[in-house]
Amino acid sequence: MKRRLLFLFAVFMVGASVGWGQMIPTYYKVAVGTDGDGSSAGSPIYKTNLETALSDAALSSLDSVIILLPEGVYSANAAPYFITKSSLAIIGEGDTSTVTIKSPVDIGLTNGGNVSFQKVHLTAKTSTGRGVVDIKSSKTTVSF
C-alpha cells in the first residue's frame, strides 16, 4: 500500500510538472486581408494592422501575447493600449531594416511584466521629440 501510494504520488508530480511550466501565448499576426481567429492553440489570430493587434492583445484571456509583424512599415494610434499581461513580445518576421514601426505607441502594462521588441526597427515620426514607444508601468523589463 505504501509503495502504491508513493508511486501514485510520483506519477502525479511528474504529470503536474509537465503542464505547470507551459504557457501558451496568444499569437497575433498582422497580415493583408480580413481579420480571423486561430483555430487551435498556438496558431495565430490574423489582424489587418498593428493597432487592431494591440487593441485585441489587451482583451486576450491568456497571460502572454506575441505579435508577429511581416516585412513592412507599421503605425498605430498613439492612444494607450492597456495590456494587463505578464509578457508582450512584438517580433518582426523579416530583417530589422524591413520591419519598421514609425508612429508613437503607448503601452500601459498595469501589472508590470516583460515587453520585448525583436527584429523591429523603431523610428520617430513626430517633430515633438517624443519617443516611439512609451511604456507606462512599474517593475517592467524591456528588451530590444
What is the role of each PLM region?
Residues 58-63, 83-84, 109-111, 136:
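Flexible, charged surface loops at secondary-structure boundaries
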